[in-house]
A protein has these predicted regions:
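The two-metal-ion catalytic cores of nucleic-acid processing enzymes
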Residues: 1-247, 255-314
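Periplasmic solute-binding protein
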Residues: 251
């Protein structure tokens, strides 16, 4: 095996490293990192800048110290500091001086989709006031783990269904599974602005912030606000997990403009399949109340469509 990383983040003075080692085993470690910088010198050295000036390598004790050093001299005339100030790249350059050979089979990728009560219109992650009724996660082999609040029957061997007696149990069961799973990558459709913030804020609301932070393998979550359609949205970076939102990726890497970017429309346009039609019911909430079986099938199908898009788009 060649070792490779799946996620590297910097927090304070440490590098939070997740990856696969040379034995093919998964590793997760916190590494205190000492970055280096280059300062110009008069005499000849073995390091030169792109424009031919000689520089000397100075190692900093900590990331804080390096940032402090840069800050201190940034306005000093004639004192230029060189080096890779984005210390993540410097760390990766030190750790992997040659090419990295990723083994895709060793990267744990899960697609996620949640359904939330919608009796009072479309649920808003900002207040996360409606209950989570169903969560489906699927891996790239097609295996699906489904957590729901009612009875669901299936002959499908690729589906494991966990029936929960209430929402608190559903979220606890899901969290336990998630912690054991330790995903490297989470994907889905609009997951970065809906599913992940909703789950985070709902768990924090029903239990506590520390419990919600367990969504990150490091127990650390960064909140940021994103303006979209003139409205403030919350997004959460779950430290240690890379988030690949297929809605964002699709907009970024396809060159055709679509009339709408719903999962149903894009799946249809790309020819991977169609969402489950529940037009015989007024809305999703009625479907949930009157035909729970179909409600769960609808949720599972959404996750399958995301995985099929992933396969098609690569």
């Amino acid at each position: 095996y060649m070792q490779f990383y799946t996620n590297v983040s910097i927090l304070k003075n440490d590098v939070y490293y997740r990856g696969v080692d040379e034995n093919g085993k998964r590793v997760q470690k916190k590494i205190p990192y000492q970055p280096h910088l280059f300062i110009p010198v008069k005499e000849k050295t073995k390091f030169k800048t792109l424009d031919g000036r000689y520089v000397e390598k100075i190692r900093q004790e900590t990331i804080y110290e390096a940032k402090d050093f840069i800050q201190k001299y940034k306005d000093v005339e004639g004192f230029d500091i060189f080096g890779n100030e984005t210390f993540i790249y410097q760390f990766l350059g030190d750790m992997y001086p040659n090419n990295i050979n990723w083994n895709k089979d060793k990267i744990v990728i899960w697609a996620l989709d949640i359904e939330v009560a919608s009796e009072r219109g479309f649920p808003d992650p900002a207040d996360a006031s409606e209950e989570v009724q169903c969560i489906t996660v699927a891996d790239k082999s097609g295996y699906k783990m489904v957590f729901g609040l009612g009875e669901f029957k299936t002959e499908d061997k690729t589906i494991q269904y966990i029936q929960c007696k209430n929402e608190r149990e559903l979220l606890e069961q899901f969290l336990e599974f998630w912690i054991e799973l330790k995903p490297d990558v989470v994907t889905g459709w609009n997951t970065s602005l809906f599913d992940i913030p909703y789950l985070y804020r709902r768990i924090a609301y029903l239990f506590s912030e520390p419990k919600a932070r367990q969504l990150s393998p490091w127990g650390y979550v960064q909140e940021k606000s994103v303006m979209k359609y003139g409205k403030k949205n919350f997004a959460y970076n779950l430290l240690g997990i890379s988030s690949l939102d297929y809605l964002d990726l699709y907009k970024k890497f396809t060159y055709t403009s679509q009339e709408k970017y719903t999962l149903g429309h894009i799946s249809y346009v790309e020819g991977v399949g169609e969402k489950i039609n529940y037009s015989e019911y007024d809305n999703l909430h009625t479907l949930y109340k009157e035909n729970f079986q179909k409600f769960i099938e609808y949720n599972i199908k959404d996750v399958e469509l995301v995985m099929q898009l992933e396969e098609k788009m690569g």
